[in-house]
Curated annotation (Swiss-Prot):
Organism: Afipia carboxidovorans (strain ATCC 49405 / DSM 1227 / KCTC 32145 / OM5) (Oligotropha carboxidovorans)
Lineage: Bacteria, Pseudomonadati, Pseudomonadota, Alphaproteobacteria, Hyphomicrobiales
Quaternary structure annotation from Swiss-Prot or TrEMBL: Dimer of heterotrimers. Each heterotrimer consists of a large, a medium and a small subunit.
Matches recorded under PROSITE patterns: 2FE2S_FER_2
Cofactor note: Binds 2 [2Fe-2S] clusters.
Transmembrane segments: none
GO molecular function, one term: metal ion binding
UniProt EC number: 1.2.5.3
Function, in words: Catalyzes the oxidation of carbon monoxide to carbon dioxide.
The protein, known as: Carbon monoxide dehydrogenase small chain
Keyword Oxidoreductase: yes
The keyword Iron-sulfur belongs to this UniProt entry's keyword annotation: yes
Catalytically driven reaction(s): CO + a quinone + H2O = a quinol + CO2
Amino acid sequence: MAKAHIELTINGHPVEALVEPRTLLIHFIREQQNLTGAHIGCDTSHCGACTVDLDGMSVKSCTMFAVQANGASITTIEGMAAPDGTLSALQEGFRMMHGLQCGYCTPGMIMRSHRLLQENPSPTEAEIRFGIGGNLCRCTGYQNIVKAIQYAAAKINGVPFEEAAE
């Protein structure tokens, strides 16, 4: 099969590559770009472990071909921290609020949460739960994930984080 030439930006870096037209974006990111933070959980768009930010949208990268991302700007979990390694507000929130256990869903959950906070900087708990509804976590029960997102929203908005009474 003839390979297709693609040009895109990943985590702020220009990328040119030859890919087979049937290569899924998640496989291109992990195998050809060696960015293994996004995980393959189901390969059927159900779990969200492969979520990346593509041109300002959350995308499950197992649902699109790499050639469809030609010309796009993609951010993966590796692109979330500052160049000096300082964690983003969301990464810090997940760490501080214990928003992970096994960690498998965490990269996709953070990427989806990042887009959620871009769209709604001060979401309610219900809006957070709805916003992350397409990303599955089999370990945490979501409560600490919700707290992590609330923590990040407070930090981004420059207000103190106050945990809701349980």
